[in-house]
């Protein structure tokens, strides 16, 4: 229950800020966290409408968006790349979607997707149902998974041994700011 409340507060209230007249489209299976916790949490926090579809279809996606008159949707992984790889049409911006949220949007297609389909805001996040921390792009900064209000550390990682690096006392070593490591 805490995760639903956190999702309503973090993704719903603080980030997407849906209105009661918004329609949030979801074509993901409800057993997926992005559908059940994120999409549902966002609409519950705003008193908005959740339009649930049976499945994702790249060829029918924008027709389904228009059918439901959606103003927002959630995505995972390569879904946006599949949409972008379809031939452009004069109807690419013929919809009311202004906000989307999800995870796995590749930085190299972020701006292209946003421009082609006329999406005002993309709220990318990073996290997992089994993790104890998450990151969200609450400020709408392009090509980033955002920040976390919770304390965390990134530690050095040895890719050859597939193990975190430890100092002489056996403690993990934090990377310097901007460094690459293990969360």
Where are these regions (language model features)?
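Conserved beta-loop-beta connector loops within the AMP-binding
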Residues: 154-183
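Conserved AMP-binding/adenylation subdomain of ANL enzymes
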Residues: 6-23, 31-71, 86
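Glycine- and other small-residue-rich loops at beta-strand/loop junctions that grip anionic moieties
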Residues: 28-29, 53-54, 76, 102-103
């Amino acid at each position: 229950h805490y995760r639903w409340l956190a999702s309503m507060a973090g993704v719903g209230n603080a980030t997407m800020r849906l209105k009661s007249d918004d329609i949030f489209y979801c074509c993901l299976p409800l057993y997926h966290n992005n559908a059940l916790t994120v999409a549902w949490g966002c609409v519950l926090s705003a008193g908005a409408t959740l339009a649930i579809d049976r499945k994702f279809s790249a060829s029918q996606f924008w027709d389904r968006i228009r059918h439901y008159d959606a103003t927002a949707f959630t995505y995972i992984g390569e879904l946006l790349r599949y949409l972008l790889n379809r031939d452009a049409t004069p109807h690419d911006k013929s919809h009311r979607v202004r906000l989307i949220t999800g995870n796995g949007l590749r930085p190299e297609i972020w701006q292209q997707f946003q421009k082609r389909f006329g999406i005002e805001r993309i709220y990318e996040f990073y996290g997992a149902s089994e993790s104890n921390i998450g990151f969200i792009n609450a400020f709408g900064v392009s090509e980033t998974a955002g920040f976390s209000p919770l304390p965390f550390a990134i530690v050095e990682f040895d890719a050859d041994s597939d193990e975190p690096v430890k100092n002489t006392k056996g403690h993990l070593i934090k990377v310097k700011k901007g460094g690459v490591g293990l969360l």
